[in-house]
């Protein structure tokens, strides 16, 4: 009788363990499928946004679009705070990522909350990235592979560290490799100034952002995850852009690619 009861107990425990394992497997499968499902939903939104861009460029719409972008992250504290603000304000952005294996949770959150993730090179070490066209292409492809393997999303947009002119004579070869790999690239046409030398206050970041937007109807704003000044100015920047009629969305491959000569 004691043996029978023990066997029953083991059987019940096994059933509970099996159910727990199956539940965990289902949860893992759901989490694995989530990035792809989100990207599919965003693709439909991007199709509509692309049509709006064409109307704006043709002068057939009074709407305006602001693409908020954040480079070099993720970073401790500031990236999460940026995401909190974006969520509170109900807007979306694009995060140009370097290789930050200790910050995968933030990248997953960026995807989960509907933002675009993009490629900003593997190391972001300027000398290493731009040693040659081949070194830059290798950095891009290494980061593509890492993001695909780590978070299940393959970026479709690249931003040259320092902007595309930083590539110098190698820019054409790198751009050709990007196109062959199915990536677009983008620079920017407005900014907070958080990547420039000198002290930056929140007030100055705000004034710089709004003044460089000017009367442009489609803007790509450069900001950086690490900047406390940008973080402090961000709510006011978003509020002002909203008041001026800007729709704030994440970049996508077929969106207007602001590129410098």
Identify what each model region corresponds to.
Residues 1-68, 75-82, 88, 204, ...:
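N-terminal pre-catalytic segment of deacetylase/amide-hydrolase enzymes
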Residues 39-131, 135-154, 240, 256:
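Active-site beta->alpha N-cap acidic-glycine motif
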């Amino acid at each position: 009788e004691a043996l029978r009861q023990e066997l029953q107990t083991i059987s019940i425990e096994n059933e509970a363990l099996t159910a727990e394992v199956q539940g965990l497997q289902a949860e893992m499968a759901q989490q694995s499928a989530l990035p792809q499902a989100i990207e599919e939903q965003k693709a439909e939104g991007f199709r509509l946004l692309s049509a709006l861009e064409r109307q704006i460029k043709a002068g057939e719409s009074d709407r305006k679009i602001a693409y908020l972008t954040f480079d070099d992250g993720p970073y401790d504290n500031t990236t999460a705070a940026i995401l909190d603000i974006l969520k509170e304000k109900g807007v979306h952005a694009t995060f140009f990522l370097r290789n930050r294996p200790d910050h995968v949770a933030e990248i997953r959150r960026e995807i989960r909350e509907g933002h675009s993730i993009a490629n900003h090179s593997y190391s972001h070490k300027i000398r290493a990235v731009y040693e040659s066209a081949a070194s830059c292409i290798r950095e891009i492809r290494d980061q593509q592979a890492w993001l695909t393997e780590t978070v299940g999303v393959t970026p479709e947009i690249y931003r040259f560290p320092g902007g595309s002119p930083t590539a110098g004579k190698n820019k054409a070869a790198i751009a050709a490799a990007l196109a062959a790999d199915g990536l677009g690239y983008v620079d920017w046409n407005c900014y907070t100034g958080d990547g420039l030398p000198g002290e930056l206050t929140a007030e100055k970041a705000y004034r710089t952002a709004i003044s460089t937007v000017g009367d442009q109807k489609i803007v790509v704003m450069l900001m950086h995850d690490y900047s406390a000044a940008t973080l402090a100015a961000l709510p006011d920047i978003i509020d002002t852009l909203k008041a001026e009629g800007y729709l704030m969305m994440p970049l996508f491959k077929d969106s207007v690619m602001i590129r410098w000569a």
